[in-house]
Amino acid sequence: MMRFLFVLLCLVFASSTFAQNNLVPIGSWQTHLPYTSSISVADAGDLVYCATGTSLYSFNKTDNSFQRLSTPAGFSDVGIRGIEFDSATQTLVVAYTNSNLDFVFDKEIYNYPFIQSSAISGDKNIYQVAFSGDTVLLSCGFGMVLFEVSTRESPATCFFTDATGANLRANGSVVIDNQIYAATSAGLYSVAMNEPNIQDFSKWDSLSGTDGLPVGEVSLIEQFRQALYAVVGDTIYRYTDGTWTPFFQEENWHSVDLFSDETYLIVSQRFGTNLPADSCRILLVDADDAVTEIVNDTQLRYLYQSVRDNNGTLWIADLYNSLLSYRDGQYSSYAPNGPATYKVQDMIVNNNILYVAPGEINASWNYQYNRDGFLVYDFGYWSAYNTFGNPILDTVYDFISVEADQRNSTVWFGSFGGGLLKYDRLANTMELFKQGYLENVPGDPTSYRVGGLALDSTYNLWISNFGAVNPIAVRKADGTWMHINPGLPTDVVNQVGQIVVDQFNTKWIQLPRGNGILVYNENSTIDDLSDDLIKVLGAGAGAGNLHTNFVNCLAVDKQNEIWVGTSEGITIFYNPGEVYTNTTAGDATQPLVNLGGYYEQLLRNDIVNTIAVDGANRKWVGTNSGAFLISEDGTEQLLYFNIDNSPLISNVVLNITIDGVTGDVYFGTDKGIIAYRYTATEGVAESSSVHVFPNPVRPDYTGTIAINGLAANAEVRITDMAGRTIWQTQALGGQAIWDGNGYNGTRAASGVYMVYATNEDGTQTAVAKILIMTTQ
């Protein structure tokens, strides 16, 4: 399985009318991952590679630039256990937490999924990667796999087993004089590289308990000059002249990595078992056994690995301080910008700014004490707002919902335990609403839980006050508050979640844990509770006709149809105004989707986590098996993305939101955020500023041409300078796409072409020019 690195060449057309975010081709992907919690580092000459638990990047020492390395660049996975670079073969190995592997040779990425996909039971983790000439030694939870760089093949898999047949874990290996030394959970073993039956573990010799090396797990192994070093417990042993002797030991100092070059053996150590560590240090051991200790409790907080480059600079992976360099007593820190966490619960875009609520709840809707605060992505830069520097958030955790006021810069975040936060982006102010505004949960007096948020057409903020005696709260547009008890069934325990508001101002409220949907309408008299319309929707004709009461998400489309995501696919309320009539006219229906000649209920076998509506009224659906684009009426599956057919970083898509200006679709997954630039944007009221990208269209560009800033569903006509129409289409929301071909399917010739766009009733027109450049 091969993938090839590609370089995305951005074609920049000098025009002040283009916003930076529009200079992205249709169909391109961009990951948004955290880069600050480093766990592995590898020196590669001019480059240093650094891995976090969720991402990989390189740092260029010559120009101080970063390159983010992830699925859009051809890498196979996210979630990294470790990396290793071999200067002799110029090979980078990326070992993932799911046992997948990528080998990077120059500009080629070779995926090796066979450990991941194997039927091996038990631990398949890859704990260490070592090189010996053309051979890569992969130390795994079951033993060792050998891989040859030149042939791209594995000549042998060695299963390490004890007397009972249970697998032994290989922690690492080194090759000296054609002899493999493997550190395992049961001690040190050795075998000749050219042993014809190397896969037979009985051919391996046990070295623990002999020549001074004690019996027990060997956690690390390394060669420095002519000596072999092994770590047993807290002690580093050295093997010279046929004897193992204790070399270095201090109680409670745990060696976590060994590295060597021509000058030093480098030992990375942590003191104690706390997180962050009580202390960390790096030991430099020279050829005369002189030990230099580097300690800095500010910079070294949870040390993972240290390597040394040819210039004598130490490059350090630290969980709390990202990639560090150390030289002449000075530390420097390096990391590309990214979100502070990979976690996502809810997202929204307002005025081209992405807001993320990264809190957590479990399947039983219990809070998880997540203190990641909230995240903001504005003009290409991520910012985090949490307890560090924001004392107002000291008692706030688990932001799981977010709503934005489209009129201004106000954004509301709902905490599942810490109340409601009002954030003004422009003023950079925060205001917290808890006691006196929201009700606590009986039996949990300090917990003010917000399960969902939604603004109605008159800008009243509706709040799911989860578990409260009055589970619906309203912050009215004038700033006053109300609390409402809709009389939910006893077994619901007033547990309320996501809220959406339809065009009738009806509130559709998720009832978690298999309790259906609450619909509530104040009947245009918000202060008069006596005339309110209330109904709980569930199974049965006239009662909602839900095919399952396990409702995960809700969405209102542009035709005021209510799309409901459940544990068993999607159902739709086509006539939401009829839900109070107790007739089948207001019931939900499962749409039938055409799957290439046969029909079935839409995503009936999928757990649907989220639904988002784009500018063309199509639905982006996030499930536990990937992301789908569904047609406006739900009868066609237009796109399906998963980890096997796209750069999507995980099949578990928890939340989707869309930037209506750019067409960016943000997928929030259980492994982080990735964005996809697609064809539909929101239409504008007046199409006074039409953008075309790319423009000019250069000869080597073969992608689609985007025309955005249009009125919704505008008719678009493209003509040559003689006025002849060569292509005509309708905008998807506020954006039209053109493949650069005429009606006859051939590429448009070099020249200037006119774009004429007219809205649906003909009252608005817009004009733009496109320069096509070909090699003809």
Predicted regions and their residues:
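Conserved beta-propeller blade signature
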Residues: 47-50, 91-94, 135-138, 179-182, ...
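Short, conserved, GDST-rich strand-edge loop motifs in beta-rich repeat architectures
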Residues: 270-277, 357-372, 418, 470, ...
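Glycine-centered coil/turn sites that cap beta-strands in beta-rich domains
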Residues: 684-717, 735-738
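Blade-level signature of beta-propeller repeat domains, shared across WD40, Kelch, NHL, RCC1
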Residues: 571, 652-683
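Short loop/turn segments immediately following beta-strands, especially the blade-tip
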Residues: 108-109, 149-152, 193-199, 380-382, ...
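Short, surface-exposed loop/turn motifs with a glycine/proline- and acidic-biased composition
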Residues: 71, 731-764
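Short coil-to-beta transitions that initiate beta-strands within beta-rich domains
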Residues: 22-44, 70-87, 113-132, 157-176, ...
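Short, glycine-anchored, charge-dense loop/turn motifs used at functional sites
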Residues: 715-726, 753
